[in-house]
């Protein structure tokens, strides 16, 4: 007689399972990761921090070119599909290819010893997904136990999954060429069956961001904002959300000793307020130091899981070593951070909405207060820029425009996210600010001390008392002075020897904004927002 869990796996096509390790404890997972017989990417290494380190193989980041969504009655009119005109990661997949991939993965997972983790995605009981993750690999089970919300013992007794992730990282798709796919690896979603299939990639982030993409599909259709942001709350219950692409400071700036962390990456905003999707944090560890990021540094202990870091024979970690990848990471349960919202990662409505950008062009001001129209414009633009070395050693800025500060994870059209966010902001009387954590005319990055001073001024309301003036080209309102912030940096023109040099760079960046925004001007709402963006001199 099959047990209930065996029957449920058999319904998915996974049969003759040797053993099911169902919802193991951290202690059990540690023992599994340390088993002497493990080899390859299954092997865990104990570091002197107490945390286990693993390697994810050739995939040290997500594989967006291998992401597909089944094109069917459920999705055909809702998904923001890729097109020749505007490319994105939502590539359509036929039902027959899906069936084939499902056979490939279920065949791989059958006749094996499996780990099954049941967890929630979403701290709101109304809007959460009950996710079941099935994998052969102990550390992948550990990763999702860290990253998703861990149900209580009572919740586990009655747990009924409404989304299933089948991780077949050890198997690839032999028919990919005939099926017209990008490669033998795949990350595929079926919204009718509510299943995610993974093949060929061991990277843990595919499971985390996969469920984020699904929340990004399901929630805005129910008028719940779905956001790639961090969030925290002050002593008075005042909530702030921080949007921003990778490397702009979301995790660093929302981890604030004066405020409690709601979450560091993915949130929803419904009629009750802001809630975290996750039960853990997935922090970058490149160049991590206790001095600069004490909370993250101290979170790396037993039960944390390090990815692709270089571990010496004595178990010490060299966080500066990027020989495997720059995208070294650690996942840990959120309670490894002291100052968090407990027991449930949620709070009220956000009063302050902060768009973080790291402008390597040296044009944008360290802070500007946005009008409602500018809020939509800069949200849809999702701008940041990095400095990339060219062959002569000159560092050229490379711009990135990523809709809603998270285009890779958007399943619906970007304007839907902007519309729902602004509705929530208007209902709560929220104010948006653009905060640039990047470079200025001195050639140096704006100091973390000044950026923290700016964030403090936004959060304590002192920015509202500041007099402002308009920055030309972008027509952004810039404060004349803020407490605890170097006044000389507030207007970026003052950081150049010649204001004309700033102006030339501003025209260049403005032209890039204008060109990027053209894709949103196919409807009236988009056309109406053009005036809120930078204006080129005729």
UniProtKB/Swiss-Prot annotation:
Its EC number is 4.1.1.49. Substrate binds at residues 62, 203, 209, 329. The keyword Ribosomal protein does not apply. It is an enzyme of class 4 (lyase). Its cofactor is Mn(2+). Pathway: Carbohydrate biosynthesis; gluconeogenesis. It is found in: Cytoplasm. Mn(2+) binds at residues 209, 228, 265. Gene3D superfamilies: 3.90.228.20, Phosphoenolpyruvate Carboxykinase, domain 1, Phosphoenolpyruvate Carboxykinase, domain 2. GO terms for cellular component: cytosol. CDD domains: PEPCK_ATP. It catalyses: oxaloacetate + ATP = phosphoenolpyruvate + ADP + CO2. Binds 1 Mn(2+) ion per subunit. Involved in the gluconeogenesis. Catalyzes the conversion of oxaloacetate (OAA) to phosphoenolpyruvate (PEP) through direct phosphoryl transfer between the nucleoside triphosphate and OAA. Monomer. NCBIfam families: pckA (TIGR00224), PRK09344.1-1 (NF006819), PRK09344.1-2 (NF006820), PRK09344.1-3 (NF006821). Belongs to the phosphoenolpyruvate carboxykinase (ATP) family. This is Phosphoenolpyruvate carboxykinase (ATP). It comes from Haemophilus ducreyi (strain 35000HP / ATCC 700724).
């Amino acid at each position: 007689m099959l047990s209930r869990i065996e029957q449920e796996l058999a319904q998915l096509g996974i049969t003759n399972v040797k053993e099911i390790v169902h919802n193991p404890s951290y202690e059990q997972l540690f023992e599994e990761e340390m088993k002497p017989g493990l080899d390859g990417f299954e092997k865990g290494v104990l570091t002197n921090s107490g945390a286990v380190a693993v390697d994810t193989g050739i995939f040290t980041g997500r594989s967006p070119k291998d992401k597909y969504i089944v094109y069917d009655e459920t999705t055909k009119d809702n998904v923001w599909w890729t097109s020749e005109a505007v490319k994105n990661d939502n590539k359509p997949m036929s039902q027959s290819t899906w069936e084939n991939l499902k056979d490939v993965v279920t065949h791989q997972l059958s006749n094996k010893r499996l780990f099954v983790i049941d967890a929630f995605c979403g701290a709101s009981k109304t809007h959460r997904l009950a996710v079941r993750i099935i994998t052969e690999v102990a550390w992948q089970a550990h990763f999702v136990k860290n990253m998703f919300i861990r149900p209580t013992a009572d919740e586990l007794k009655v747990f009924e999954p409404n989304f299933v992730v089948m991780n077949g990282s050890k198997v690839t798709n032999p028919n990919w060429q005939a099926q017209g796919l990008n490669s033998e690896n795949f990350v595929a979603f079926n919204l009718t069956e509510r299943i995610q299939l993974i093949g060929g990639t061991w990277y843990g982030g595919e499971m985390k961001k996969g469920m984020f993409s699904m929340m990004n599909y399901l929630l805005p259709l129910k008028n719940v904002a779905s956001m790639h942001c961090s969030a925290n709350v002050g002593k008075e219950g005042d909530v702030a959300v921080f949007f921003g692409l990778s490397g702009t400071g979301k995790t660093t700036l929302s981890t604030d000793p004066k405020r409690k962390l709601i979450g560091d990456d993915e949130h929803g905003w419904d009629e009750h307020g802001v809630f975290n999707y996750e039960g853990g944090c997935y922090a970058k560890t490149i160049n991590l130091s206790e001095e600069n990021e004490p909370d993250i540094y101290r979170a790396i202990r037993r039960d944390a899981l390090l990815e692709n870091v270089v571990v010496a024979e004595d178990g010490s970690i060299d966080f500066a070593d990027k020989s495997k990848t720059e995208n070294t990471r650690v996942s840990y349960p959120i309670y490894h951070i002291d100052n968090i919202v407990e027991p449930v990662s949620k709070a009220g409505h956000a009063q302050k909405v902060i768009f973080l950008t790291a402008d390597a062009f040296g044009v944008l001001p360290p802070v500007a207060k946005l009008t409602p129209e500018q809020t939509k414009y800069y949200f849809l633009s999702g701008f940041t820029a990095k400095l990339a070395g060219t062959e002569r050693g000159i560092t050229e800025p490379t711009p990135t425009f990523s809709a809603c500060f998270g285009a890779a994870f958007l399943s619906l059209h970007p304007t839907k996210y902007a519309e729902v966010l602004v509705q929530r902001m208007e209902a709560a009387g929220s104010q948006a600010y653009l905060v640039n954590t990047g470079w200025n005319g001195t050639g140096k990055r704006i100091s973390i001390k000044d950026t923290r001073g700016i964030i403090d001024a936004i959060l304590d309301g002192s920015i509202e008392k500041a007099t402002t003036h308009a920055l030309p080209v972008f027509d952004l309102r810039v404060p004349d002075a803020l407490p605890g912030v170097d006044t000389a940096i507030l207007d970026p023109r003052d950081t150049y020897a010649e204001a004309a040099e700033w102006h030339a760079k501003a025209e260049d960046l403005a032209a890039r904004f204008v060109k990027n925004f053209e894709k949103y001007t196919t409807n009236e709402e988009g056309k109406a927002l053009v005036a809120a963006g930078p204006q080129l001199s005729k």
